[in-house]
């Protein structure tokens, strides 16, 4: 990853776009498919890089920034349930200094002179849930989903042993939130059963819990030994108690399972003592934990702290260090991605790390192999933190055989055998054979049908591979003629291995439904290099309709300078991305395919939707010292109400809130005749919004 301190604005734009796409894909795999693609530590590194870039270039923050998102978009398998208040993620702390910074932020935000008590709880590695009770009866259970909308798992949650279906002396309306998990021994037993029945084993206990809970047949869930802890009262918690400590006592009285291994701390030293205790004893616990959660204990102070887009300010998760293992590197395979990028993957002698068997690890890129001097038959060190594909951190040189040789970077594509293109500035190697490369064509079709693109459920990896191998599809357009081809064929798809009448009917129904698609999704589905969801939305907003989009792209490919400049002026689109767009539309097959898709699809014009309120979109500047609230708290409140907080006064400023010792900003506001109010007026204003 590039040095953030040295990165240019243009490089930052490109990197933020790449990070948004990559993290969104990892979120979908983790939250929806229950199939993590990268280690927790690697994910956290990418997420923190995104945050640092946004802090350095706040004007480049994307609409689909990972810092604004919580989980991943939900599937269509279960009914949707909207959470009354979002089920947010937590920010992370990785060392003692991060925790000290967290404590200092609380003090500064709330203007406290002394340590505010912090409640500490183990961070359970499971699946988050919400449960609603009305008049003491369990009526609804839901997953976290994307944080705002979850999946209805009411029938499944009722099968969990000791999960209350009825509560005595409960309020008229009650919500509880917590974590559903599977104990280590039950996980091993379940995997043994899976293996005996010829089914795929679960990668880790979290995947097993998530996969067991998200079953359409609740009787399957009932057969799994799921357990739970509650830790929150959701929308109702502040009606039940005045602190986190009191809340857990109350929830236990109602009959819920709460984690007894928790502690109210009154100093940083007590926090670190509790953390070390859990870190040392985690292997002795019957369930997996991956850190400690710290929450401001007082609910009134929590209310004042509030939230940022993705997480509460009053809580953080202190992660445990990754688990390290060592095993033999058997071989290095090379995968070819949708845009031709080659990625090396280490094939390993299976090793158990933290209760999970690992046989593959990412090597990221070929420079990484050279930098670490990783060789076949080496013994390598692995770092794992709740992941499926961990990271290789180094080589045990002392165990290296004498006859090993350095890994040769490939010269030809392993899929189509064409000569490879080296792009040292991108640290990548690419196959430029496009759709003539079987691997790229396969990945392009996979991308086209994916959840955030055309969203054709029933076309997973195996199905796409099968249809290509049988010659039933060779490009995205063929998908929409698959039913027609099947109807006229003597050998029906439903009679082939892996298919049945119902699955084929559902597939054709899903293909038909996907024909109605928004312009941003369609552009994203095309798989243009560096055009992720955010840039697809930018292009859709700029051109408005499919017809205008394709017409302008054809002009761009003919070097129309007006279109080039118009796109270059868009925030998020730069010279490098424009070159990728031009290269894509320079290929005649691409343009022909898009035009034919336009004939069979109903591509909806772009529509901008914005939620309006009296402060939405207003630009506000705070200056000087406010008597009773911190600037951070005032800014947070303004942003929560939809306003934009600026650092300087300009003709675009709508309102200036001035405190004591307001200086040049106040003077400039007067010169520009901008409305100026004090703290008292500000507090009245936000109270009435």
From Swiss-Prot:
Q: Which GO terms describe its cellular component?
A: cytosol
- Name this polypeptide is given: DNA ligase
Specify whether Cytoplasm is a keyword of the entry: no
Instruction: State the Gene Ontology BP annotations.
Output: DNA repair; DNA replication
| Active site residues per record | 123
What enzyme class is recorded for this protein? Answer: ligase
Q: Which NCBIfam families match?
A: dnlj (TIGR00575), PRK07956.1 (NF005932)
What cofactors does this protein use? Mg(2+); Mn(2+)
Record's keyword terms, sorted: DNA damage, DNA repair, DNA replication, Ligase, Magnesium, Manganese, Metal-binding, NAD, Zinc
Q: Which family does it belong to?
A: Belongs to the NAD-dependent DNA ligase family. LigA subfamily.
Domain of life according to the entry: Bacteria
Q: What CDD domains does the annotation carry?
A: BRCT_DNA_ligase_like (cd17748), LIGANc (cd00114)
Q: Which amino acids does the record list as binding Zn(2+)? A: 413, 416, 431, 437
């Amino acid at each position: 990853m590039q040095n953030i301190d040295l990165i240019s604005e243009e490089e930052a734009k490109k990197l933020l776009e790449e990070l948004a796409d990559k993290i969104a894909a990892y979120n979908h795999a983790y939250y929806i498919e229950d199939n993590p693609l990268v280690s927790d530590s690697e994910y956290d590194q990418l997420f923190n890089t995104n945050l640092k870039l946004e802090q350095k270039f706040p004007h480049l923050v994307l609409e689909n920034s990972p810092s604004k998102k919580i989980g991943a978009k939900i599937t269509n398998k279960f009914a949707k349930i909207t959470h009354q208040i979002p089920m947010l993620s937590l920010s992370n702390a990785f060392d003692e200094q991060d925790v000290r910074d967290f404590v200092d932020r609380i003090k500064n935000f709330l203007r406290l002179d002394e340590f505010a008590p912090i409640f500490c709880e183990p961070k359970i590695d499971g699946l988050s849930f919400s449960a609603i009770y009305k008049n003491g009866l369990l009526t609804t259970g839901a997953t976290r989903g994307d944080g705002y909308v979850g999946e209805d798992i009411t029938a499944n949650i009722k099968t969990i042993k000791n999960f209350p279906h009825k509560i005595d002396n409960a309020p008229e309306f009650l919500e509880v939130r917590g974590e559903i998990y599977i104990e280590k021994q039950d996980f091993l037993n379940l995997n043994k059963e899976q293996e005996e029945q010829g089914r795929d084993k679960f990668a880790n206990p979290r995947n097993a819990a998530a996969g067991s809970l998200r079953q359409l047949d609740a009787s399957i869930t009932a057969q799994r030994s799921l357990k739970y802890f509650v830790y929150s009262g959701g929308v109702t918690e502040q009606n039940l108690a005045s602190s986190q400590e009191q809340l857990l006592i109350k929830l236990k009285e109602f009959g819920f399972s709460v984690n007894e291994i928790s502690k109210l701390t009154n100093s940083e030293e007590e926090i670190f003592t509790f953390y070390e205790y859990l870190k040392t004893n985690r292997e002795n616990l019957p369930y997996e934990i991956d850190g400690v959660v710290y929450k401001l204990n007082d609910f009134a102070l929590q209310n004042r702290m509030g939230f940022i887009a993705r997480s509460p300010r009053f809580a953080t998760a202190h992660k445990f260090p990754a688990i390290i293992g060592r095993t033999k590197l058997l071989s290095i395979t090379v995968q070819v991605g949708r845009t031709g990028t080659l990625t090396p993957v280490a094939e390993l002698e299976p090793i158990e790390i933290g209760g999970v068997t690992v046989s593959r690890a990412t090597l990221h890129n070929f420079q990484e192999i050279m930098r670490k001097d990783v060789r076949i038959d080496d013994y390598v060190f692995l770092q794992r933190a709740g992941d499926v594909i961990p990271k290789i951190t180094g080589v045990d040189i002392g165990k290296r055989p004498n006859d090993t040789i350095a890994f040769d970077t490939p010269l030809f594509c392993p899929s189509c055998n064409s000569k490879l293109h080296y792009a040292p500035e991108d640290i990548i190697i690419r196959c430029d054979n496009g759709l003539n490369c079987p691997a790229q064509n396969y990945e392009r079709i996979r991308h086209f049908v994916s959840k955030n693109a055309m969203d054709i459920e029933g076309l997973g990896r195996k199905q796409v591979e099968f249809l290509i191998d049988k010659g039933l599809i060779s490009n995205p357009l063929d998908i929409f003629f698959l039913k027609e081809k099947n109807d006229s064929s003597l050998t029906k798809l439903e009679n082939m291995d892996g298919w049945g009448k119902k699955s084929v009917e559902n597939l054709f129904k899903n293909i038909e439904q996907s024909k109605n698609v928004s312009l941003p999704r369609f552009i994203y589905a095309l798989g243009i290099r560096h055009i992720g969801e955010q840039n697809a939305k930018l292009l859709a907003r700029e051109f408005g309709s499919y017809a205008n989009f394709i017409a302008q792209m054809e002009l761009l490919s003919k070097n129309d300078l007006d279109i080039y400049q118009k796109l270059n002026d868009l925030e998020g689109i730069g010279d490098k991305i424009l070159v990728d767009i031009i290269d894509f539309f320079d290929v005649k097959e691409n343009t022909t395919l898009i035009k034919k898709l336009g004939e069979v699809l109903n591509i909806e014009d772009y529509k901008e939707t914005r939620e309006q309120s009296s402060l939405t979109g207003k630009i506000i500047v705070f200056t000087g010292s406010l008597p009773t609230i911190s600037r951070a708290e005032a800014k947070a409140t303004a942003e929560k109400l939809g306003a934009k907080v600026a650092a300087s006064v300009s003709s675009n400023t709508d309102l200036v809130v001035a405190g004591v010792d307001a200086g040049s900003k106040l003077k400039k506001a007067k010169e520009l005749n901008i409305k100026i109010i004090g703290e008292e007026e500000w507090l009245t204003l936000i109270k009435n919004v």
